[in-house]
Curated annotation (Swiss-Prot):
Species this protein is from: Pseudomonas aeruginosa (strain ATCC 15692 / DSM 22644 / CIP 104116 / JCM 14847 / LMG 12228 / 1C / PRS 101 / PAO1)
Top-level taxon of origin: Bacteria
InterPro entries, per database record: dITP/XTP_pyrophosphatase, ITPase-like_fam, RdgB/HAM1
Summary of the function given for this chain in its UniProt record: Pyrophosphatase that catalyzes the hydrolysis of nucleoside triphosphates to their monophosphate derivatives, with a high preference for the non-canonical purine nucleotides XTP (xanthosine triphosphate), dITP (deoxyinosine triphosphate) and ITP. Seems to function as a house-cleaning enzyme that removes non-canonical purine nucleotides from the nucleotide pool, thus preventing their incorporation into DNA/RNA and avoiding chromosomal lesions.
CDD domains assigned: HAM1 (cd00515)
Record GO terms (molecular function): dITP diphosphatase activity; ITP diphosphatase activity; metal ion binding; nucleoside triphosphate diphosphatase activity; nucleotide binding; ribonucleoside triphosphate phosphatase activity; XTP diphosphatase activity
Binding residues annotated for substrate, in chain numbering: S11, H12, N13, A14, G15, K16, S72, F155, G156, Y157, D158, K178, H183, R184
Metal-binding in keyword set: yes
Active-site positions on this chain: D71
Protein known as: dITP/XTP pyrophosphatase
Subunit structure, interactors included: Homodimer.
Keyword field: Hydrolase, Magnesium, Metal-binding, Nucleotide metabolism, Nucleotide-binding
One GO term describing the cellular component: cytosol
Enzyme Commission code: 3.6.1.66
Origin organism lineage: Bacteria, Pseudomonadati, Pseudomonadota, Gammaproteobacteria, Pseudomonadales
């Protein structure tokens, strides 16, 4: 079991930072990679796992601290898993609104029965940059893609992701509830279990 007093979170994404800090709680002091560098590593992996490890190693190298990275995205069944690892850059880096518009356009003629999707999160924790045994935890949240945006909470694809067990979009959930149900919450629960938190 790894004992952590502090770690660096390998993300400049304010939404992810807020979610993951809330999930980790006060037992571990979380610092942002932004305290050490504004440069993000090139995500050259072909999977969420590869990119999470790459980001964690980079953050550990820059900070000298244990590092936690999240690589996550939306995998839409009808689109063969796209946008997948390219979720944040789906509309050529033009932001959440453009990503959502592109997804709605790609799905406009898709019947309801074929709109299944999953939010996927892979957390990678490394003790140091050359850690030969990263801890990997995966969370998957099943849902479907709506025909229009709904809700004002969250970020990314949350307004388009229907949560069947709550009969609403992810963006209609209170942040506390999303932090209990989401793909990141599922991955974080596994990580906390592995760390004995």
């Amino acid at each position: 079991m790894i004992k952590l007093e502090q770690l660096v979170l390998a993300s400049h994404n304010a939404g992810k930072l807020k979610e993951l800090q809330a999930m980790l709680g006060a037992s571990v002091k979380v610092r942002s990679i932004g305290e050490f560098s504004q440069v993000e590593p090139e995500e050259t992996g072909l999977s969420f796992v590869e990119n999470a490890i790459l980001k964690a190693r980079n953050a550990a190298r820059l900070s000298g601290l244990p590092a936690l990275a999240d690589d996550s995205g939306l995998a839409v069944d009808f689109l063969g898993g796209a946008p997948g690892i390219y979720s944040a850059r789906y509309a050529d880096g033009r932001g959440d609104a453009a990503n959502n518009a592109k997804l709605l356009e790609a799905m406009k003629d898709v019947p309801d029965a074929e709109r299944g999707a999953q939010f996927v999160s892979v957390l990678a924790l490394v003790r140091h940059a050359d850690d030969p045994l990263p801890i990997l935890c995966e969370g998957i949240w099943e849902g479907r893609i709506l025909r229009e945006a709904r809700g004002a909470h969250g970020f990314g694809y949350d307004p388009l992701f229907w949560v069947p067990e709550r009969d609403c979009s992810s963006a209609e959930l209170a942040p506390e509830e999303k932090n209990r149900l989401s793909h990141r919450a599922r991955a974080m629960a596994l990580l906390k279990q592995r760390l004995g938190l």
